Amino acid sequence: MESMLILLRGNSGSGKTTIAKAVQHVFGEEAVLISQDVFRREIFCVKDTPNNLASGLMKEAVLYAKGKVPMILVEGIYSREKYQDFLDFLMKLFPQKKLVYYFDLSFEETVKRHQTRMQRDYFSEETMRKWWLARDLLFPQESLKERLIKEGQTIAETVNQIMADYEEIRRRD
């Protein structure tokens, strides 16, 4: 079985986890979800630093899932500054079979979305501002570009877009 990577990146509060879980729900056991927050904050309880312990286990999880499920969803902030090694690993592991999305939202929109989350009291708007990265695109100059998720898109529209993109690539095979 050939697996496809679906990478969802963006700032805190942009909706990455919500979308990843919704896509996983649609595909069920045909999709595995590797969430940066789960590995970093829940399994290891480590700070968001380059090459933290969670990065290694996330790599192992991707390697384990590759070839066992059709879809590997990887979601998180994954800033280029801190996670370039991990991102390079993913791009090399999936040279053809990948969809890369970036949640291109304003800071104000991420704060608004954060207020609807169960974790809204875990960190403040001020903390979010410190973490904020404007358009931290993985391929800023290259022909291979992230597909941008924009502010006005609903959850359903975003999930449908990912599903359609996924099916289009599968049909090409």
Q: Can you annotate each of these PLM segments?
A:
Residues 53-95:
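Glycine-rich phosphate-binding loop used to anchor ATP phosphates in small-molecule kinases
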Residues 21-67:
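Conserved substrate/cofactor phosphate-moiety recognition/catalytic segment
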Residues 14:
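ATP-binding Walker
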Residues 8:
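Hydrophobic anchor at the beta1->P-loop junction of P-loop NTPases
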Residues 119-161, 169, 173:
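Small-molecule kinase domains that catalyze NTP-dependent phosphoryl transfer to phosphate-bearing small molecules
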Residues 17:
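Walker A/P-loop
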